[in-house]
């Protein structure tokens, strides 16, 4: 299940763990990414809380926790090569994995069609 937020994050659910990243739209708006800061594994995040930072030559932008949960894994490759987040944001450029407190909360987020209309 793939869902999107109005802050331009995407989540892909596998069981009760969601992989989180920025959308292609957000990556396009930011331009070339030069720095990525990710949350610590084990961190408890609350929906709406700043969880990560992506920085481009244009601007630094917070990435917000789309839902509440615990960080189970971070993408160290994204830290080592921030440009990968911009070139493959919904693939190899994922940011972190979040064990959701309530996986059913995914239903509150936008599906791909709704996000496409929102991002226009």
UniProtKB/Swiss-Prot annotation:
The glycine cleavage system is composed of four proteins: P, T, L and H. GO terms for cellular component: cytoplasm; glycine cleavage complex. The modification N6-lipoyllysine is found at residue 58. Belongs to the GcvH family. GO terms for biological process: glycine decarboxylation via glycine cleavage system. The keyword Aminoacyl-tRNA synthetase does not apply. This is Glycine cleavage system H protein. Its cofactor is (R)-lipoate. The keyword Membrane does not apply. Binds 1 lipoyl cofactor covalently. The glycine cleavage system catalyzes the degradation of glycine. The H protein shuttles the methylamine group of glycine from the P protein to the T protein. It comes from the Bacteria. Residues 17-99 form the Lipoyl-binding domain. Keywords: Lipoyl.
């Amino acid at each position: 299940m793939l869902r999107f937020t109005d802050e331009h994050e995407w989540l892909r659910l596998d069981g009760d763990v969601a992989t989180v990243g920025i959308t292609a739209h957000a990556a396009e708006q930011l331009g070339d990414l030069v720095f990525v800061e990710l949350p610590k594994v084990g961190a408890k995040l609350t929906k709406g809380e700043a969880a990560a930072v992506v920085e481009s030559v244009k601007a630094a932008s917070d990435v917000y926790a789309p839902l509440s949960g615990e960080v189970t894994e971070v993408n160290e490759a994204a830290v080592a090569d921030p440009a990968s987040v911009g070139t493959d944001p919904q693939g190899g450029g994922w940011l972190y994995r979040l064990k959701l407190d309530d996986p059913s909360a995914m239903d509150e987020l936008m599906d791909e069609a709704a996000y496409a209309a929102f991002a226009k």
